[in-house]
Amino acid sequence: MVSSRPRRRKRASATQLYQTCKAAGTCPPDVVHKVEQTTVADQILKWGSMGVFFGGLGIGSGSGTGGRAGYVPLSTGSRAVPPKSLVPDVVARPPVVVDTVAPSDPSIVSLIEESSIIQSGAPSLTIPTEGGFSVTSSGTDVPAILDVSSTNTVHVTATTHHNPVFTDPSVVQPIPPVEAGGRLIVSHSTITTSAAEEIPLDTFVVHSDPLSSTPVPGTSGRPRLGLYSKALQQVEIVDPAFLSTPQRLITYDNPVFENVDDTLQFEQPSIHDAPDPAFMDIITLHRPALTSRRGVIRFSRVGQRGTMYTRRGTRIGGRVHFFRDISPIGAADDIELHPLVASAPHTLETPHTLETPLDTTDALFDVYADMDTIDDDAAYATFSLHPADSTRISNTSIPLATVSDTLLTSGPDIVFPSIPAGTPYLPVSPSIPAISVLIHGTDYYLHPAYYLRKRRKRILAHQYVAT
């Protein structure tokens, strides 16, 4: 089996080596002498050519061409070469005759031919026999006006309008410049004083003053940090020193004057063991950031690892997101409120059988009741409320006090109309008769205090209440 030999690469020539190594100054001496023609042979030719001249034989360091005539054999002579005519074969032009100037000839030579000289003199007048202008004369003193304008007349008119709102009437306006040709007719009116016209203007800026004493500038959206992308490794740190002195988790040195709120740079040796294995090969630790994620406050820093080195000294490594959860964000606590003034409980019965204790101490009083006639003995009153369309009717029972300790006052009575029952029963529309006071409506309701605080009824003899 024949083994394949490695292919031999072509070596660089001296010229190529000189071009690459001359700027750096690392060229070998033989390459420099060969390219710059400073070898021993070149020096001999340079100094010897000063005393010896070989003519056009072509002997030298150049290519051997034998000179201009080339190589000629010594035994034979050179062949004759017919001369070539530089001027092509054309018809010869006649020779120019040159006249000689004799000594007796004038020294002024005329350069203009006599045939081109025009004799000066008064030209003869030619009187036309036909044509001309017809002039009509009259005996009056009015001068004649002749229309000598052409038929193609262009009329240009310039009109200027002055607005008294923006023009001061006391200033005389000059005639506007007009750049045109032909006949120009420029007219302008006399400037007179006139009253200014009121033009309604729209207000674009409605309110330029701040709406508050301390206006709050508009806040722009916070940039997205992108801490949870696939390009970052997520590492949770348990050590609390990560919040205050993160450099202690990366190196054993003690940088006294470093600010932990800025980006930290670390120069690690090739073999280094970090105090915390999670911070191995960390060369850059960026500034901290506080974020909220999943109901907790998170302290985050992004670090850059320097795992590999290149020949140029560049460090290559991944990016890591170090975080630590500080505290959870809990829900708002329910604060139990207690009444400041104790009061008697009251029960409100609704159609849904829901009992609600009411405090009537701070409730609104009846507009028909007097502040001096309010009875505080009705401590435990139970009443029921039903909607207007319910068939159930209930009364409010209030224990009455004796006549001796009660001040009797007369107040307005509300008389509810009633429909007498008849036979047969006829349908009545509406089913509920109209009354002067409505306690149920579509857009309002009666406050519960009005149900509880009723006005005092007129008490007659034998403890009966007037209805």
From Swiss-Prot:
Gene Ontology BP annotations: microtubule-dependent intracellular transport of viral material towards nucleus; symbiont entry into host cell; viral penetration into host nucleus
Record's function text: Minor protein of the capsid that localizes along the inner surface of the virion, within the central cavities beneath the L1 pentamers. Plays a role in capsid stabilization through interaction with the major capsid protein L1. Once the virion enters the host cell, L2 escorts the genomic DNA into the nucleus by promoting escape from the endosomal compartments and traffic through the host Golgi network.
UniProt GO molecular function: DNA binding; structural molecule activity
Matching Pfam families: Late_protein_L2
Posttranslational modification: Highly phosphorylated.
Compartments where found: Virion; Host nucleus; Host early endosome; Host Golgi apparatus
Renumbered ranges of motif Nuclear localization signal: 1-12, 452-462
GO terms under cellular component: host cell; host cell endosome; host cell Golgi apparatus; host cell nucleus; viral capsid
Keywords assigned: Capsid protein, Cytoplasmic inwards viral transport, Disulfide bond, DNA-binding, Host endosome, Host Golgi apparatus, Host nucleus, Host-virus interaction, Late protein, Microtubular inwards viral transport, Phosphoprotein, Viral penetration into host nucleus, Virion, Virus entry into host cell
Primary residence: virion
Subunit structure: Interacts with major capsid protein L1. Interacts with E2; this interaction inhibits E2 transcriptional activity but not the DNA replication function E2. Interacts with host GADD45GIP1. Interacts with host HSPA8; this interaction is required for L2 nuclear translocation. Interacts with host importins KPNB2 and KPNB3. Forms a complex with importin alpha2-beta1 heterodimers via interaction with the importin alpha2 adapter. Interacts with host DYNLT1; this interaction is essential for virus intracellular transport during entry.
Source organism per UniProt: Human papillomavirus 40
Xref: InterPro entries: Late_L2
Protein name as it appears in the record: Minor capsid protein L2
Keyword Phosphoprotein tagged: yes
Similarity field: Belongs to the papillomaviridae L2 protein family.
Cysteine disulfide links: C21-C27
Organism domain of life: Viruses
